[in-house]
Amino acid sequence: MNKTDLINAVAEQAELSKKDASKAVDAVFESITGALKEGGKVQLVGFGSFEVRERSARKGRNPQTGEEIEIPATKNPAFKPGKQLKDAVN
């Protein structure tokens, strides 16, 4: 399912126009992104939680030359599914 499919599903299930469903989906994405940018965590009970995980700096190798390089620390968004979502999938 891509974003267009999600908008269509939201429009159908919530009986909204595609324009309103698109605004709602965009608002959810922007809200989650904004909270994560500020270092927060988004918990949706039963669905799961979004958070930022820090990955420390580490050494790696350039696959073309074999030269050892330093890979800088990064912050990555992560999603942990909730119990109800896990149960629904299994």
UniProtKB/Swiss-Prot annotation:
<feature type="modified residue" description="Phosphothreonine">
    <location>
        <position position="4"/>
    </location>
</feature>
<dbReference type="GO" id="GO:0005829">
    <property type="term" value="C:cytosol"/>
</dbReference>
<keyword id="KW-0226">DNA condensation</keyword>
<dbReference type="InterPro" id="IPR000119">
    <property type="entry name" value="Hist_DNA-bd"/>
</dbReference>
<dbReference type="InterPro" id="IPR020816">
    <property type="entry name" value="Histone-like_DNA-bd_CS"/>
</dbReference>
<dbReference type="GO" id="GO:0030261">
    <property type="term" value="P:chromosome condensation"/>
</dbReference>
<comment type="similarity">
    <text>Belongs to the bacterial histone-like protein family.</text>
</comment>
<comment type="function">
    <text>Histone-like DNA-binding protein which is capable of wrapping DNA to stabilize it, and thus to prevent its denaturation under extreme environmental conditions.</text>
</comment>
<dbReference type="InterPro" id="IPR010992">
    <property type="entry name" value="IHF-like_DNA-bd_dom_sf"/>
</dbReference>
<protein>
    <recommendedName>
        <fullName>DNA-binding protein HU-1</fullName>
    </recommendedName>
</protein>
<comment type="subunit">
    <text>Homodimer.</text>
</comment>
<dbReference type="GO" id="GO:0030527">
    <property type="term" value="F:structural constituent of chromatin"/>
</dbReference>
<keyword id="KW-0238">DNA-binding</keyword>
<dbReference type="GO" id="GO:0003677">
    <property type="term" value="F:DNA binding"/>
</dbReference>
<dbReference type="Pfam" id="PF00216">
    <property type="entry name" value="Bac_DNA_binding"/>
</dbReference>
<keyword id="KW-0597">Phosphoprotein</keyword>
<feature type="region of interest" description="Disordered">
    <location>
        <begin position="55"/>
        <end position="90"/>
    </location>
</feature>
